[in-house]
Amino acid sequence: AITEGLVGSEMCIRDRENSLPVFDKIKKQIKIPVLTDIHNVEQCAIVAPHIDVLQIPAFLCRQTDLLIAAAKTKKIINVKKGQFLAPWDMVNVTKKISDSGNNNILVTERGASFGYNTLVSDMRSIPIMAKNGYPIVFDATHSVQQPGGQGNKSGGQREFVEHLSRAAVAVGVAAIFIETHQDPDNAPSDGPNMVPLKELDNLISQIVQIDNLVKKNNV
């Protein structure tokens, strides 16, 4: 399990003395690896000592300077495939990281734009991107996001998270990315696509069973 945080540029630069110790506290208390988004070059070196995985958001996956700066920290880099990219285009993204001396790369599938306010998950993208030699992660909650679907904010269809999670694990992935909250409808962000915390155990149990079956049969 990996827990996710979010570092905004304003918080990181202006108030990092207060914000960054939060990551240290999470690691100490929960004793699991910590992952966080980064949004600009300056954040990479600042955040890296406090986390285990630097995450490149989907919309920033083609920002060469950000990819290089993240790579130079030598941390594990989880780069999300842009909703606007074909899966075979991700080889160019990962090459920028590896050419910078870092092969600790994860690639995340999080859906593809399909008209207005919706995404679809093309499971073919998983084996296609896996051919590049890096572990593939499936982001089950952002894949059901409806960008701008509620007018002034994004919507989501959390009822499909479990279905897509099971499908991705059956195809074969290294990890599943799931956002959860004890009260998703009142979460600060991404609530409509989050899995309620009380339902997480059952979902994890399902996907672990499928994963064991897939690995047993060497799929």
Residue ranges and their predicted role:
Residues 167-219:
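Structured C-terminal cap/extension of enzyme domains
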Residues 14-35, 70-76, 126-136, 164, ...:
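Alpha-helix-loop-beta-strand connector modules within alpha/beta enzyme cores
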Residues 73-180:
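Catalytic alpha/beta core domains of metabolic enzymes, predominantly
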Residues 9, 147-148, 185-188:
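A short acidic, helix-capping loop that chelates divalent metal ions and anchors anionic groups
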Residues 1-8, 12-13:
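Single conserved hydrophobic/aromatic residue that forms the stacking wall/gate
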Residues 43, 65-66, 125:
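Short acidic active-site motifs
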Residues 32-40, 52-65, 76-87, 105-111:
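Catalytic beta/alpha-barrel core
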